[in-house]
Swiss-Prot record:
Provenance organism: Rattus norvegicus (Rat)
GO CC annotation terms, alphabetical: cytoplasm; mitochondrial inner membrane; mitochondrial matrix; mitochondrial permeability transition pore complex; mitochondrion
Annotated localization: Mitochondrion matrix
Changes after translation: Acetylated at Lys-166; deacetylated at Lys-166 by SIRT3.
Protein known as: Peptidyl-prolyl cis-trans isomerase F, mitochondrial
Length: 206
């Protein structure tokens, strides 16, 4: 499941905040991007994920990738969104969703949290831990321990500062946090989703 450390099967993310532990645990596409905030760079890529649940559209999530801080990690995610390497996120699922924590996706090989791969090979090292898990909408890499980044990622729905220094933050939601909340509503304490949540399309906006 997630890369929040739990051994070789990418089962991490089973532990919640210290103060409140969890019980369970392609081409590029042009469209309107989100408004850029003061902490955004006009040079950073904007990508999108179109998401559905049991075949019904939920909407679009637009993400800014912080290429100005973590260029290698941002490029991995960007290319997996466009599918330009011949593989990527389109058709994969949000396989693990824990309300009041995070929504995890990116395993496009096994679809259960045990697979996925990066554009650099199976895994690549932690780039840096400059960006922090400061609140809802943070985009971060899942892993199975240090230097095991692949394609799995998660979007936080709360501040998750206990993950700082363990997971590489590389972006944030620019538009569509309401869609993230819809995804979150189909989750459970175990992470199992009540509906099949699929990335029906994805790509790059700018």
């Amino acid at each position: 499941m997630l890369a929040l450390r739990c051994g070789p099967r990418l089962l991490g993310l089973l532990s919640g905040p210290r103060s409140a532990p969890l019980l369970l645990s392609t081409t590029r596409t042009c469209s309107d991007g989100g408004a850029r905030g003061a902490n955004s760079s006009s040079q950073n890529p904007l990508v999108y994920l179109d998401v559905g649940a049991d075949g019904q559209p939920l909407g679009r999530v637009v993400l800014e990738l912080k290429a100005d801080v973590v260029p290698k990690t941002a490029e991995n995610f960007r290319a997996l969104c466009t599918g330009e390497k011949g593989f990527g996120y389109k058709g994969s699922t949000f396989h693990r969703v824990i309300p009041a924590f995070m929504c995890q996706a990116g395993d496009f090989t096994n679809h259960n949290g045990t697979g996925g791969k990066s554009i650099y090979g199976s895994r690549f090292p932690d780039e840096n831990f400059t960006l922090k898990h400061v609140g809802p909408g943070v985009l971060s890499m899942a892993n199975a321990g240090p230097n095991t980044n692949g394609s799995q990622f998660f979007i936080c729905t709360i501040k998750t500062d206990w993950l700082d220094g363990k997971h590489v933050v590389f972006g944030h939601v620019k538009e569509g946090m309401d869609v993230v909340k819809k995804i979150e509503s189909f989750g459970s304490k175990s992470g199992k989703t009540s509906k099949k949540i699929v990335i029906t399309d994805c790509g790059q906006l700018s």
